[in-house]
């Protein structure tokens, strides 16, 4: 692990925040990290370089950073020439961030926007320009909801590079049938491909968390294989929730209420080339999408009484 952290990832010209300076800033602000907000700040320059290098952001990118905290990752992103919109829920940290950037490189401040907001309520009309990338050290307690919200709300986002709790990283990248495979694994693949990019030691954070972190990158599909409108996505996600709410049941039994009867459930599954005896935890995102679309072909309806769209009939992406 240590050898990974020492690797040189990319050259930065801005002086980054180290552990001593982060502690000094916290003391200056009379600030104590709150566990309820998942506030753990990365202070290791090599880790910051690694995250930025993995993201691949450049001058052409508008980066959405979630939970910038005291600004170590923000500085590195600005150093790459990107425009950065930093979304920080803590008002004290949000107010201090522009001053920190100005102190380290005054010329970069023009490319920084800070929003004192909860990322889960962020809407696209609040940003002057659509973001092309997300790069963040995500608070553990909101990692999955934040990822799904941002991918749905901002279709302009092409890549997501985040540090999350190692367990969350494993779940996001898990394959069908594995013990870590679950709702997050499937839903994030509705939007794009997921890959793990290594582990991150707890010692690079202040305060030191009790668990390892994982670095994850998500690349949105260049062209979505299925409709991306909110109604279609909601129906697919409903099937995912049903399947994993009863993950040890066979698919036939898990989808009885949704289909209306056991026989209809089996027929819809067979129409989608899914063995009714399979368990929900073995289904891929392709399986869930196909199940919904084949149900529509058979005349199945959603709870509002309208047939789910088949491929190519989706509304503009949200």
UniProtKB/Swiss-Prot annotation:
Top-level division of the source organism's lineage: Bacteria
Enzyme Commission no: 2.1.1.182
Record keywords: Cytoplasm, Methyltransferase, RNA-binding, rRNA processing, S-adenosyl-L-methionine, Transferase
Positions with a binding annotation for S-adenosyl-L-methionine: 40, 42, 67, 88, 118, 137
SUPFAM superfamilies: S-adenosyl-L-methionine-dependent methyltransferases
Protein name per UniProt: Ribosomal RNA small subunit methyltransferase A
Subcellular location: Cytoplasm
Biased composition range(s): Basic and acidic residues: 295-305
PANTHER family in alphabetical order: DIMETHYLADENOSINE TRANSFERASE, DIMETHYLADENOSINE TRANSFERASE-RELATED
GO cellular component: cytosol
Catalytic activity: adenosine(1518)/adenosine(1519) in 16S rRNA + 4 S-adenosyl-L-methionine = N(6)-dimethyladenosine(1518)/N(6)-dimethyladenosine(1519) in 16S rRNA + 4 S-adenosyl-L-homocysteine + 4 H(+)
Stated role: Specifically dimethylates two adjacent adenosines (A1518 and A1519) in the loop of a conserved hairpin near the 3'-end of 16S rRNA in the 30S particle. May play a critical role in biogenesis of 30S subunits.
GO molecular function, one term: RNA binding
Residue stretches in coiled coil: none
Alphabetized Pfam families for the sequence: RrnaAD
Ranges where the record places region Disordered: 295-318
Family assignment from sequence similarity: Belongs to the class I-like SAM-binding methyltransferase superfamily. rRNA adenine N(6)-methyltransferase family. RsmA subfamily.
Organism annotation: Mycolicibacterium paratuberculosis (strain ATCC BAA-968 / K-10) (Mycobacterium paratuberculosis)
